[in-house]
Curated annotation (Swiss-Prot):
Its EC number is 3.4.21.92. This is ATP-dependent Clp protease proteolytic subunit. The gene is clpP. It comes from Hydrogenovibrio crunogenus (strain DSM 25203 / XCL-2). Pfam families: CLP_protease. The keyword Cytoplasm applies.
């Protein structure tokens, strides 16, 4: 069984008193009851499947109540990230996003994809945007195919970032050409988040 960074760490347990006695939950399951999802660590297929499942479950529980997605991620797989992105856009509840720590690469893309007016960052968090990374070895014809694919993905991500931030596509193309790090306030000015929160 594949494990995630959360599974590898010691996960706190919460004990609740109910009319039927005590029930114990791991902290993430307990927070899921409050409609809080954590996107922590590398964005990869296993993590994406878990987040998609949680989004769909919370929609089935209440399609009218916001879902809160907390992000602390260095980024990762574009296809895994797009599975989360498409599900966020597909479901009925608004998905509010919050950057805690860092949201880089695909993490920043998902941060910007939160519901309008409900995208937040904590004051010391960092955000980084850049173009998708590619690495492929093989025959020249296969490399050419993969190069075309990554250019198409880059164009699609840039268009979505332009839509979410309100920045012109030319600005996005220029700013994502290399790693572009921002403070929480800079990310807010850029349009990646709507507000920097210092207190609840």
């Amino acid at each position: 069984m594949h494990s995630t960074p959360i599974q590898d760490a010691l996960v706190p347990m919460v004990i609740e008193q109910t009319s039927r006695g005590e029930r114990s939950f791991d902290i993430y399951s307990r927070l899921l009851k409050e409609r809080v999802i954590f996107l922590v660590g590398q964005v990869e297929d296993h993590m994406a499947n878990l987040i998609v499942a949680q989004l769909l479950f919370l929609e089935s529980e209440n399609p009218d109540k916001d879902i809160h997605l907390y992000i602390n991620s260095p980024g990762g797989s574009v296809t895994a990230g797009m599975a989360i992105y498409d599900t966020m856009r597909f479901i009925k509840p608004d998905v509010s996003t919050m950057c805690i720590g860092q949201a880089a690469s695909m993490g920043s893309f998902l941060l910007s994809a939160g519901a309008e007016g409900k995208r937040y960052a904590l004051p010391n968090s960092r955000v980084m945007i850049h173009q998708p990374l590619g690495g492929f070895q093989g025959q020249a014809s296969d490399i050419e195919i993969h190069a075309k694919e990554i250019i198409q993905i880059k164009q699609k991500l840039n268009k979505a970032l332009a839509d979410h931030t309100g920045q012109p596509i030319e600005v996005i193309e220029n700013d994502t050409d290399r790693d572009n790090f921002m403070s929480a306030d800079e990310a807010c000015d850029y349009g990646l988040v709507d507000k920097v929160l210092t207190r609840r």
